[in-house]
Design a protein with these regions (language model features):
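Buried hydrophobic positions in well-ordered alpha/beta secondary-structure cores of metabolic enzymes
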Residues: 1-2, 75, 123, 143
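ATP/NTP phosphate-donor binding region
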Residues: 1-64
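Short glycine/serine/threonine-rich phosphate/pyrophosphate-binding segments
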Residues: 5-8, 82-87, 119-120
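Accessory alpha-helical/coil subdomains and C-terminal extensions
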Residues: 17-32, 147-186
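Short acidic/histidine-rich motifs immediately flanking catalytic phosphotransfer sites
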Residues: 68-74
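Short Gly/Thr/Asp-enriched flexible loops that form oxyanion-binding sites at enzyme active sites
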Residues: 76-98
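Internal gly/pro-rich beta-alpha loop/helix module
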Residues: 102-173
Length: 186
C-alpha cells in the first residue's frame, strides 16, 4: 500500500507507481540505532482499494512483527482514502502497547511541497521512540500525532487533511512530544 507517498509523476504527467520498500531504503535520515525491516504489500492498488481482508492481513503481519520478530515499533504506510477507518480497525484488532504508527501522504513524491518524506521519517522516529509506548495505534501526518480512535480525514487533498479534536502530540525537529494519553479499553 502507501501509493501516494512514494508515487512519482513522469515527464508526460502520468502517475507512476513506485516501489515503497526501495523508497524507504533510499532515505538517508535515519539514526544509526534504528533498524528497519520492510514488509511490502504492493498488491493493494491504493488507499481506496483496501478491503477488509487487506486490513486483517495487515493486522496479522503487524502481530507477527511484534510477537515473532520482537519489533519495538511498527509503521504502516498506506493510502489516505480509508486511513481513518483502517487505523481504527488496527487499534481495535491489535490491542498492543507496542507503538504502531499509520502514515501516508496527500501529494506524490515528485510534487512541490510533497510531505511524504517528512511524514515517513516522523512515523519511523515516533515508532522507535519510547514516548509512544502504551498509546496504541496512532496516525502521524503533517507532524501531528492523532489517536486512531479519533482521527478524521477532513479534506480530500490538503496536506493538513487529517485532524482530531485533541491531537495527542507532535513530532517536530525529530523530537516526539506527547501532550495527552488517550484512555484505552482492553
Amino acid at each position: 500500500g502507501g501509493s501516494t507517498i512514494a508515487d512519482q509523476v513522469d515527464a508526460s504527467g502520468k502517475r507512476c507507481r513506485a516501489d515503497l520498500a526501495e523508497y524507504i531504503r533510499s532515505m538517508h535520515e535515519f539514526d544509526g540505532n534504528i533498524e528497519i525491516s520492510i514488509v511490502a504489500r504492493n498488491d493493494i492498488a491504493a488507499g481506496y482499494g483496501m478491503q477488509i481482508p487487506d486490513v486483517l492481513e495487515t493486522v496479522r503481519e503487524v502481530r507477527r512483527a511484534i510477537d515473532e520478530d520482537q519489533a519495538d515499533g511498527v509503521v504502516i504506510v498506506m493510502g489516505t482514502d480509508c486511513m481513518e477507518e483502517a487505523a481504527f480497525a488496527f487499534e481495535t484488532l491489535l490491542q498492543t502497547d507496542v507503538p504502531v504508527v499509520v502514515t501516508g501522504a496527500m501529494r506524490v513524491a515528485t510534487a512541490r511541497g510533497a510531505e511524504g518524506p517528512a511524514n515517513l521519517l516522523n512515523a519511523i522516529r515516533a515508532a522507535a521512540s519510547d514516548a509512544l509506548s502504551g498509546l496504541g495505534v496512532v496516525v502521524i501526518l503533517n507532524e501531528w500525532i492523532h489517536s486512531a480512535l479519533y482521527v478524521q480525514k477532513l479534506h480530500p487533498s490538503n496536506c493538513a487533511a487529517f485532524g482530531s479534536e485533541f491531537p495527542i502530540g507532535m513530532v517536530a525537529e525529530g523530537d516526539v512530544s506527547i501532550r495527552t494519553r488517550p484512555i484505552r479499553r482492553k
